[in-house]
Amino acid sequence: MQRENEVQHVFLVGAKSLGAYGGYETFVYKLTEYHQNKKNIKYHVACKANGDGCMDETKVDGVTRINDHEFEFHNAHCFKIDIPQIGPAQAIYYDVAALKACCKYIKEHRIKHPIVYIMACRIGPFAGHFYKEIHKLGGTVYLNPDGECEIIWTTRKKPEFMRVCAA
């Protein structure tokens, strides 16, 4: 259970960028924008470093660049994942690489009780491995089971428990 003065670290995996590319991207943009002044929440957002829909933080106002693959935006720590051009398998590769990066960051920074929110269910047989690793690190995993983030965000016609997970 989180104490009042502790920061809740939330890792977001599944959006290619922060911006107008699609539903997940808009969801993450609005979520981080809405919570940017909250001192007790720290978002860590995985972004695609190259290819279609990749994050180009130089085109976004308010970005603080950390290095070639990390930046701060809306008080969220954003990190870019390099993706090989392997056709439709890019989405799966991105999710697996992003989850590996999340686990590495959690370990290196000794983050207690992290939350990892996976927006799209694309990792299939790899899910169990990451669930075990994140749980072993003291974390919780939330998976958007139907991958309809934009519908949840805009229409709010999902059951109450889905709204809590996605909004």
Model-derived features: where do they sit?
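N-proximal low-complexity "stem/linker" segments adjacent to membrane-targeting elements
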Residues: 2-5
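N-terminal strand-loop element at the rim of the active site
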Residues: 7, 12-21, 34-89, 122
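Conserved alpha-helical elements of sugar-nucleotide-dependent glycosyltransferases
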Residues: 23-31
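A generic structural motif
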Residues: 38-44, 111-112, 138-139
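A short, charged, and often flexible helix/loop element on the N-terminal side
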Residues: 73-100, 154-161
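An aromatic- and histidine-rich active-site surface loop
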Residues: 90-101, 114-150
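Glycine-rich phosphate-binding loop signature in dinucleotide/nucleotide-binding domains
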Residues: 105-114
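Nucleotide-sugar donor phosphate/pyrophosphate-binding loop at the beta->alpha transition
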Residues: 139-140, 150-167
